Amino acid sequence: IWSGKVLGVSGWLGAFEVEWQQENPIDLEICTRCNGCVRACPEGAIDFSYQIDLDKCKAHRECVKACGAIGAVDFARAATARKENFDLVLDLSREPLIRLHDAPQGYLAPGDDPLEQALAVHKLLGLVGEFTKPRFTQYRERICAHGRSGKTGCTQCLDVCSTGAIRADGDHVRVEPHLCTGCGGCATVCPSGAMTYAYPRMPDLGMRLKTMLATYLEAGGHDACILVHDAEAGRDQLRALGRRAGFGERGLGRKGAGRGLPARAIPFECFHIASIGMDFLLGAVAYGASQVRVLATGREAEGYVAALREQMSFANTILHGLGYEGEHFAVIEAQALEQALWQLAPARTVGKPATFNLSADKRTSLDFAFDFFFKDTTKKTQEIDLPPGAPFGALTVNKDTCTLCKACIGACPEAALLDSPEAPQLRFIERNCVQCGLCVTTCPEDAIRLVPRLLLTAQAKEPVTLNEAEPFNCVRCGKPFGTKKMVDNMTGRLGTHSMFATGGALKRLQMCGECRVIDMASSKNEPSILDYTGRK
């Protein structure tokens, strides 16, 4: 038993670390409950809780003498911070010590309600033993657009995670699998596909979706509406809706009875609704669905629902741009579920269901979907404008300010920006761009701007030249080593500096790397390290 003021709690089931400040001189872990200090205290400042009332204490220290060699009473201990590890944590504070929407498993904070406290204690009894959990996500740092060279780009997964399982780790992110609860929100918002949903896998969800819709269409169904719900609160909501159908809300007969689900509404259970991203949404319509509605029960973190609505906004914009009328994707609140489904007008469907399968690589699945819709529709739109934040788009480069320093090429994690071995060129493959903005923040000339859009032609997969310049040849050997604009800019800025005012230092900036070394070694006017020998 320890006492004191808790400073912080971290960790997860079986590995919590609690740090606290010892506020009372008596250490309950060492105390033997001999009552010697209680009898010795002349002010009666110690009761049978074996904690000293410091307002009554007059510092006689008789309790210290009474405790003797046991050493449980130490007035110098109060200033010491302590740490210990615990398997489970029951937090009875008025305000939880861990302020997360989804707290770690094994941490319970029932508040000050006695019933909730009793239920929490009962739940703790079931958290004893050995447990296994899947690793819900896979992370490929090579294509992660979080950062490069200390510059921050994409922070989507960090912003959406409600468990604190994802943290920045230099130019990449680090996922703590013990804290991850498998919502899949990080994989949904990840623009590059660096974060993928490993359990359950998207190919498995896609195959289940494809089979379900194929069976429905073969049976003569039409205008299918996929109703996505989670395996807990969402499932309970649908069961309650079914029980209420035909019997009224109070069980008093058919008058005022609920209607249940429309025949075209097909429930689709997933682990968590945050895992439903653009690949699933567009895949459902490509497989023959008219619409997808996702049931939000109110238990989800607000950030997940907001991210889901944003993904739906991107997907709706793309389908509208291709001529598919109607609202294909939306979130339905639990209290309005029945009414919203019955009032829902069907949206336009595809002519013939797609045959491709959803892949674990989100960008690949989306490429398949875009190609399919472009071939299926009669509106052959080649370019669709997208709202800011979309994971597709182009770049514009200000050719007047760009010096082709190529810093943006080194910063791009998706190989969307390329160099040319033949000439000073900045080339761009639009299909690879995820609009992370690293090129914008890295550019020293502030010459790059993002253009969110979706290009549906073959040009999106081909390199295009954004800027090119006249090469600059070394004034000593004639070898090209940069652009004329870059060298002129460099000499113009450094020409007035004292280090380049004398000798051939300024001219040396117009030489390639090898010639600079040769020129410095052969010049008699340049100071040598030997010139400084013996100086203090």
Task: Label each PLM-derived region with a short phrase.
Residues E422-R427:
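A cross-kingdom feature marking solvent-exposed beta-strand/loop segments within repeated
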Residues A59, K65-G68, Q156-V173, P177-G184, ...:
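Cys/His-rich finger/ribbon microdomains and the adjacent scaffold used
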Residues P104-L108, L213, L241-G246, A301, ...:
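Short secondary-structure boundary/capping segments
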Residues I1-V160, G164, D223-L238, E249, ...:
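Ferredoxin-type iron-sulfur electron-transfer modules and their immediate structural context
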Residues C180-C186, N432-Q435, C439, P444-I448:
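Repeat-solenoid scaffold signature
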Residues V189, T196-P203, T441, E445, ...:
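Catalytic cores of secreted or luminal carbohydrate-active enzymes
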Residues S192, Y197-F247, R259-R264, C270-S290, ...:
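Charged, low-complexity interaction segments
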Residues G170-T211, R293, A306-Q311, H328-A334:
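Terminal amphipathic helices with adjacent charged low-complexity linkers/tails
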